Regions:
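Small-residue hinge/turn detector
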Residues: 132-144
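Glycosyltransferase-associated regions of secretory-pathway enzymes
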Residues: 1-131, 149-317
Length: 317
């Protein structure tokens, strides 16, 4: 089983369960997290400047948002609680309840998408890479936080923003016990404006552009990080949701992580996993409790959005 994944990049979800006992033993230090003791800066003050509590989220190509995306947006607004929250679109989706809710939760701003490879303007980016480059450009210019639309914030990030351990922090991903499978997953990324690591990451696209889905944004990004220690920190508590053996393992994960990043949430295998574990229902309860506690009486439209999300998760997950 281990030989099947050793040194290979996975192109599809592996059979359930993902980790064999041997893989679990070897990879545990990479993704298993200690309980979070509490909020606030630990030890001495950070030597790095604080990161702006501003969230930038692109929504490109004009597609329709799903209710799980709205749950993610509610988690950003009411659990992360940024000072500003912007949703950038290049082409407005058709009017729909989800688009209306999205623009109630965040400030929707039209913004052109990057279509050319950074540093190589003669080469066009694949459309699925537009958001990857755009997130780096927005964070480089403004600083702040990027949260992908399949990620759900379940615990405050205030201490990381106030006392960052590096100018850039992102998710850690390891899809097998092989060191070659390590990735910097930018599905959740915190960054100071003008961070050197962001410039290096953007430059790496121009030098080594690949049309593979995540080679530049994840695999190549980890190589850049490894070559420049101290400029970034990769963290398992900001990384993608691992695949666990039991339902209890998934719920124990909620006690250890800050974000549930359910990558590939539109794929059947992931939806089956979330349904079987009940994990998204647990996330829904955390997020809607925070949202309903914060919403005022006048915010009846937002309350209606939250109610629609709750009913959708009950029915679908």
């Amino acid at each position: 089983m281990l030989e099947r994944y050793e040194g290979r990049r996975l192109l599809a979800a592996p059979p359930w369960p993902f980790f064999t006992p041997e893989q679990t033993r070897l990879s545990r230090p990479a993704w298993e997290l200690p309980p979070i003791a509490g909020q606030g800066c630990s030890g001495q003050a950070s030597s790095h400047a604080s990161i702006p509590a501003v969230v930038h989220q692109p929504w490109l190509h004009g597609g329709a948002l799903k209710w799980e995306h709205i749950l993610g947006m509610l988690s950003v607004r009411y659990v992360l609680r940024p000072k500003r929250y912007k949703l950038y679109y290049d082409k407005a989706p058709a009017p729909s309840p989800t688009w209306r809710c999205a623009c109630l939760i965040a400030h929707c701003v039209q913004h052109s998408a990057p279509t050319r490879v950074p540093g190589n303007t003669g080469k066009r980016l694949k459309m699925y890479h537009w958001p990857d480059v755009m997130r780096l450009q927005l964070l480089l210019k403004h600083g702040g936080v990027f949260v992908d639309h399949d990620a759900f914030v379940i615990r405050s990030l205030d201490d990381l923003l106030r006392c960052p351990e590096a100018p850039v922090m992102a998710g850690f991903e390891q899809v097998s016990a092989s060191a070659t499978d390590r990735k910097l997953n930018p599905g959740v990324m915190l960054a100071a404006p003008n961070a050197t690591m962001l410039r290096l990451l953007l430059a790496s696209w121009g030098r080594n552009y690949s049309t593979e889905w995540d080679w530049n944004c994840c695999s190549r990004s980890y190589a850049v990080h490894a070559a420049h220690p101290g400029l970034a920190q990769v963290r398992a508590d900001l990384g993608p949701l691992p695949r666990f053996r039991t339902k209890q393992d998934y719920h124990d994960h909620l006690k250890r992580t800050r974000v549930v990043h359910a990558t590939a949430i539109s794929h059947r295998w992931r939806r089956q996993e979330l349904r079987a574990s009940g994990l998204l229902r647990a996330v829904r309860d955390i997020v809607l409790t925070a949202a309903n506690t914060s919403m005022g009486e006048a915010e009846w439209e937002l309350k209606a959005c939250a109610a629609r999300v709750g009913a959708y998760v009950d029915h679908t997950f």
